[in-house]
Amino acid sequence: MSNLPKPASHFEPEKNVDDKGNVTGSAPPVSKDTPTQQASVSLPNQEEPTQQTLVTTELPTKPDYNDLLLKASDERLLLVKEAKPQTLRFYASPTGLTASGFSIVTSPTSSYEQHAIDIFPYNCPVDKIVPAFTLEQIKITNDVLSSAQQSYLSRIPHDTSLVKLNEIEVVTGGSRDLFSLGTGYVMVVPNAEFFEGANLKFVYGVPMADIIFSKLTSQSAADYAFLDRSRIASGFIMFALHFALRTNVNLVVTKDNSARFASELSYSRPMSFVQGKKIVLPVQPHVCFAEGNSLMRYLDTALEGKYTQGVTYKYGRERIITETKEGGPITEITYLNIDNVTAQALGITAHVIGIDRYREDNVKRALLAYSLSGSTVDLMQSDESERMFGRMLSPQQELSYLLVGAALSQDVYKTILRANLDAFMMFGTVMPSLSDSLAKIPADAGNQQIISLIRERQSVSGFENAMEYLAMQVTPPLIWPCVISREVNVTGLSLLIMLLEYILFFIFYPSLAKKCGAGLCNNFYKLVFALSNSEWSQFVTRVGYDGTLGNSIPITDEDYWSNARRPALFTTDLSQFRLLGLIQRLIAPIGEHREHVKAQAAEFPRLKARTEYWNPYPNPGAQHVEQTIFKARLLQAFDETLTLVKDLNQTGQLVSKTLMAGVAKVFNTCKIKLRYHGVGFGRDIGMPLAYLRDRKINFYHDYDGRLDTPFPNQMMLVSASQSPHDHKIPIELRRKGQIVLETGVVWTLVLGLQFPSHQFDEDMTNDPICKFRAPSPGEELGKDDTIIAMCANACVPFSIAAGIISESYADGGMKEIKELLSGSLSSTEFRNLISCIQTAMQGSGFNVGRNRDVFRQNETVDLRFIEPKVRYVENELTIIAPTPQDPPIIRGDLQLIPEGLMPRFRLGLTAIADSSSEYSRLRKGLYLARCEVDVEAPNNALPLDLRDYVEVEYSHDLFQVRRIQTKQALGIFYQGEFYYRPALVPKMLIVVNTSEEMEPSYQEFFMQCLEERRIVIKLPKMYFLSRIVCTHSIQRPDERDAVLGLLAVRNDQIPLVTFYDTEQVDPTIQFDGLASGSKSKFIWPISSIDQNVVVRALGASGSTAPIGFAAPTDSMCDSGSIDDVGNLTTGAGVLKDPRVISLTNGVINYTERANLTGRVLYRYRPAYALDSY
């Protein structure tokens, strides 16, 4: 088993490769202990020819299992190290003109670049299967008998010309050691090697983990630190989780971990099981490989009887599922000595990989979506001798991760925004201006004040903020921004500057301006009040701030975002008002509707099926027309705002005429700086932004190019019950003050930009050269997949935790966990559970995505959800029922857990926690009764007829204290009689459902009644851990202290109970003197405690079975069958039950011909221009 799937991504970051598929460039460092990753695609070696004996003389060195996991994880992470830096590239227009200062200028005939990507980064090939359960031996003999066993192999009859002793040892040596003479028990127990590094402690075969569920830990449990219920419940969950993670592996059988035995030779059992078979090494022990033991013929006889009755045992490769055209095997059915729970989990993993096959078109369309229009991407043909196996996430899964990730952490929005900003800046098509245009204006008395004001407003937000705001327009609005409503404390020129500033903000950032509409419109209204008080008065009287006559109360962001109040500036025709009409006309959106064509073709995650978006910067096209409607609106804003303010200032009451003359000069300078903003915004800014809209992470937007339309209702994460009182977490955070925008940024866009494409030599041409760095599709795709992976790393633990507490999931061990916890989880406990799951996933080498990073979660949010869903919510309270017009993710369910993970989790939980499971060591129910026994065995039933006893349920009222003669006496009060002498108590079956707060005096009285054999105490709800000890009856300790301990157990404790086996006695132990033939036994299990025993009592040689001998069950020896999709059935054709132990099972394995990395080579020639969408 090894590290796990990484379901939050389709692709690994690209690598540069040569035409042979080898990685070139600055490859990531490779540890000397880690095999170098090869990118070549070559024909695998054909199946090796059959030989008579291919078993080597030495077993492979047993690797440390934790190292195996980490090695597999590290090999996967080698593929995602930081890509080597790339030289900045720019591309020329078809004219072929060059420009100094740029390193590369290409043409339409540029050569192809060759790259490689791995499209299945979460497959995990391993060369060894470590089962979750293994066999453990309990000996009953000392060295005297062991020496007889040690000489056994020397007396095995065999033909050395046919089979060598070391070959027998390879196949059967481990089994012969385990099932050897002098063995008391061979039992099935959890495998410490499998769970190495999992921070699980096994006590009597029951897993314990650090406490998740704190409420059950009390001071009374202090003396039983490893035995409180919460530790066991935690242990069960962490066991099942690690089981699910570590069985998500793919066994690859190669020459190094396999061998073959000749089919022509004549073998006897057990070697005949592997005759002519290709087997997987190392061979795990099994009782069927212990056959042929001349010292214990009774064991052979028992096994022979099973084979006669139709039990079939198999080991090695049985058949080939798929093969190459040349006949080389790709996938196979192989039988191993592993438990059926592990085998069933591996079957689930194989099924998931088998049904989700690589599709070439998907990969090509994804790469094209991350390429500029006009780029060429060609996938290079893979080797026909290989077959790809792996999983690719569906758009629904990726969308689920993004939405829930956003609900769990605000870092998701910030990370997506940063990725968009970095990708935008990568193009290199816009940069900060190195010149100061305002400094070039000749100073005079009229312009110094306005220059100072503009510099002051420009200083509040620089070039990086300006670019970030541009990137925000394509980033999903997961956190809504606002603009602060300012007090009316501006006068003079500031009124003009602020009026123009707010108008320009709507032109440059239309989608952000709409979301900030409350603050911006409040500020507009205040400016109108200061510039034209009469117009403001008429507006309030005849219209009102929000269309309500006479209403001049400022609109809050909360009211605006919930559509409770909307500014009249957006919703009402104000053309009858001169200033307000001008504002309304200038802030009206301009642009065009476009669609995410490439994203739709690539089937990227999108909230809506048809994804139109508003493009505020129309592309000027290949002719590079400067006079675009966007540039015209900018110039119009400067001209008409100045003209109107001049008209309002005819008497100079607002601004002196000298200052107004200076304003005209400064505005002319600003308009000159807008000279290239038509092509600059339409192509050099607009086209990179249009490219970003097709990326995976930009999965939705809500701006429709209109100011008068209301906002959609808020998306939230809710429980499946959708009760108004259930917890809700906003996916879109609409909360004032989360992001505050500075409108002064517009002066940076006006005065502080330069477009490298426009630095042409005007004597040569006026055609702007298109210079930019083209994106590298595989690299950019890998970056976005990493973000989705980080979302998944937060979502999967959350969704697993939600699944664990789901009320609909109440079987397969979950019932036992709920009984152990006896209550619902608090918010803190649920967070603890998520944290433990997250740690387990990272510690085991499992990462849902290619990245170990996890977004920091919002600590104040209550995360307890039952089957979380995404729904629209009105006013953060009312959940709106989905309609057919809603997006599919709103109408349907989230897909958060990687396919196969929860079925494997439930398999593991059923096996270890279900009270009816033979694998589980947690037992429930005890009898306390004194009976005399000569010898005892753990599975002995209570030898009493309980029909002779009157059943009474224990309560405090059962006891009374009365004065008897001169002293107070404690006794049982039953049917009007008081019994204070234990010997006189009537025969009673006392059912104790809880011993919580049972007085010590009551416990002592019960003990005396037990001594007198008057009562039987039944503890039906008591969970306990059991172990079996083989000992002589003389050595067995008295059980009275243990009985008192059981009566004192609190509800938050689980006791350890030892059961003794005195049937199997070491004959070398001698006792002097006489001993009674019987012993008092007090503790009896209600149900069997030895279901996990494979064999018992191998304490004698010969053909006669010793007392207490128990052979393995049929199911333990029944290999059954496995179909091509991983389903395990018994020999009778019934699906194998994970609660019934089976120790021989089939698995689907792969050969070296199976491509589990999904490495794909592709050729890429980037576009040379930014002229087309």
Curated annotation (Swiss-Prot):
<feature type="compositionally biased region" description="Polar residues">
    <location>
        <begin position="33"/>
        <end position="53"/>
    </location>
</feature>
<keyword id="KW-0946">Virion</keyword>
<dbReference type="GO" id="GO:0039625">
    <property type="term" value="C:viral inner capsid"/>
</dbReference>
<dbReference type="Pfam" id="PF21416">
    <property type="entry name" value="VP1-like_C"/>
</dbReference>
<protein>
    <recommendedName>
        <fullName>Inner capsid protein VP3</fullName>
    </recommendedName>
</protein>
<comment type="function">
    <text>Inner capsid protein that self-assembles to form an icosahedral capsid with a T=2 symmetry, which consists of 120 copies of VP2, with channels at each of its five-fold vertices. This capsid constitutes the innermost concentric layer of the viral mature particle.</text>
</comment>
<comment type="subunit">
    <text>Homodecamer; each decamer is made up of two conformers of VP2, called VP2A and VP2B. 12 homodecamers assemble to form an icosahedral capsid.</text>
</comment>
<keyword id="KW-0167">Capsid protein</keyword>
<keyword id="KW-1141">T=2 icosahedral capsid protein</keyword>
<feature type="compositionally biased region" description="Basic and acidic residues">
    <location>
        <begin position="9"/>
        <end position="21"/>
    </location>
</feature>
<feature type="region of interest" description="Disordered">
    <location>
        <begin position="1"/>
        <end position="53"/>
    </location>
</feature>
<dbReference type="InterPro" id="IPR049422">
    <property type="entry name" value="VP1/VP3_C"/>
</dbReference>
<keyword id="KW-1153">Inner capsid protein</keyword>
<dbReference type="GO" id="GO:0039616">
    <property type="term" value="C:T=2 icosahedral viral capsid"/>
</dbReference>
<comment type="similarity">
    <text>Belongs to the turreted BTV-fold inner capsid family.</text>
</comment>
